[in-house]
């Protein structure tokens, strides 16, 4: 039941992660330019927006639970539990939003360690409370939901504590929280396209899930188990893409465009090496890894099929994620949005439809929808990056900034 909710949860995360990215770019540019007043205004605006958006997310999230689950063709036998999980999750989504925004601020000023430590702490707390609520108190999916929102709230409190206690210009000043129009405009101009892209991509995954739901229950469970491995493999490249955005933003603010380009190259190389290594390990040990989430032989067999079909394409994600992050770092977020929506939404849905019409809803065709979207997106993103000011930055123009 929890596995069937992933697309809806990711839609919420994607929507606000985009705004977090926008805030991070604005803050990193101000930090790189050593503009302390602009930096402080951006931080106070970010936290104020988080209060407003968390209330909106809670209300809208609870209202869309039932329609979204039915849109996914969620089987009736798991519908009540999935609905219970999502209702609790959205009701407690404030912690997630504050952690995302707060950690985005820290990463924007070069502090990526503490958000990672807090995230690891939250993961451990989540496991402990999962065991306590689900195994100990036998609360089922409701217990899993409570464990998740408690762990997210604790991570948010830790991030807020760090940002409150610092003496740096990016400190949160609770008595001075307000919306500065210039900061709001910048955050939304950069973050809104990213939010739309991530939310609509997750929304399209609702339909992908409906294609998965066409197959038997073992396939659904196998896909859910595979998704957990997928999330693990993608953590490094997504983190490096965020680092790319921050690094480029700081150097863009400081007028060092060529240095930003060099950083993007190194980030891309690192992401390819790490992703390739994780891909090989996952393919070799797919059986034991999948059994950690579900030990049913039928479920494991389907999970291994997803790993075998999709995993060889993971390296292609490095190109679209790193280059998209770099483009956002210089304030160009509309182009990545258009490219990703075209690839991850339009092309993917067309691919699935053709698979259904011409190949009778084949399993392999359904599984290939994701990697084919990655390939198309990477090709388009490489072209866009090469044509950008960042991609064209020359060794003779180390300090040039092209608006």
Language model features: what each stretch is:
Residues 23-24, 64-65, 102, 129-130, ...:
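Hydrophobic/aromatic residues in alpha-helical transmembrane segments
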Residues 3-7, 82-86, 145, 217-232, ...:
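Small-residue hotspots at the loop-to-helix junctions and early N-terminal turns
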Residues 88, 99, 122, 151-155, ...:
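Transmembrane helical elements of multi-pass membrane transporters/channels
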Residues 1, 69-76, 132-139, 199-232, ...:
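Helix-terminus/linker motif at the lipid-water interface of multi-pass membrane proteins
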Residues 20, 88-107, 115-123, 144-157, ...:
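Short runs within selected transmembrane alpha-helices of multi-pass transporters and secretion channels
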Residues 112-114, 141, 218-219, 333-334, ...:
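Membrane-helix interface segments
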Residues 2-59, 96-115, 209, 223-286, ...:
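Small-residue-rich hydrophobic transmembrane alpha-helices
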Residues 27-94, 136-192, 248-313, 356-403:
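Short alpha-helical transmembrane segments in multi-pass integral membrane proteins
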């Amino acid at each position: 039941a929890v596995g069937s909710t992933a697309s809806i949860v990711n839609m919420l995360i994607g929507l606000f992660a985009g705004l977090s990215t926008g805030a991070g770019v604005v803050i990193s540019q101000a930090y790189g330019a050593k503009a302390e007043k602009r930096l402080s205004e951006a931080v106070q605006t970010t936290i104020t927006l988080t209060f407003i958006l968390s209330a909106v997310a809670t209300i809208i999230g609870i209202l869309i639970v039932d329609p979204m689950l039915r849109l996914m063709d969620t089987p009736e036998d798991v519908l009540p539990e999935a609905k219970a999980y999502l209702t609790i999750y959205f009701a407690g989504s404030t912690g997630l939003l504050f952690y995302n925004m707060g950690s985005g601020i820290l990463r924007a000023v070069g502090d990526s360690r503490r958000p990672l430590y807090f995230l690891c702490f939250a993961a451990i707390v989540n496991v402990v409370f999962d065991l306590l609520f689900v195994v100990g108190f036998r609360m089922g999916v409701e217990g899993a939901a409570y464990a998740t929102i408690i762990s997210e709230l604790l991570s948010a409190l830790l991030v807020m504590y760090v940002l409150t206690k610092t003496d740096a210009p990016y400190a949160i000043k609770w008595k001075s929280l307000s919306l500065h129009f210039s900061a709001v405009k910048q955050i939304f101009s950069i973050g809104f396209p990213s939010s739309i892209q991530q939310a609509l991509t997750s929304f399209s995954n609702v339909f992908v899930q409906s294609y998965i739901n066409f197959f038997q229950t073992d396939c659904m469970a196998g896909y859910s188990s595979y998704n957990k491995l997928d999330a693990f493999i993608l953590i490094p490249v997504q983190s490096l893409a965020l680092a790319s955005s921050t690094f480029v933003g700081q150097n863009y603010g400081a007028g060092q465009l060529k240095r930003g380009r060099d950083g993007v190259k190194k980030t891309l190389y690192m992401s390819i090496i790490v992703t390739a290594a994780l891909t090989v390990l996952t393919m070799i040990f797919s059986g034991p890894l999948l059994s950690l989430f579900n030990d049913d032989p039928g479920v494991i067999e389907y999970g291994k099929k997803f790993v075998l079909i999709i995993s060889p394409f993971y390296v292609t994600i490095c190109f679209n994620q790193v280059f998209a992050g770099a483009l956002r770092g210089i304030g160009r977020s509309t182009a990545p949005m258009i490219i990703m929506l075209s690839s991850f939404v339009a092309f993917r849905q067309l691919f699935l439809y053709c698979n259904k019409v011409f190949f009778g809803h084949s399993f392999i065709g359904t599984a290939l929808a994701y990697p084919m979207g990655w390939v198309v997106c990477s090709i388009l993103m490489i072209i866009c990056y090469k044509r950008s000011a960042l991609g064209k930055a020359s060794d003779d123009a180390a300090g040039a900034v092209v608006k």
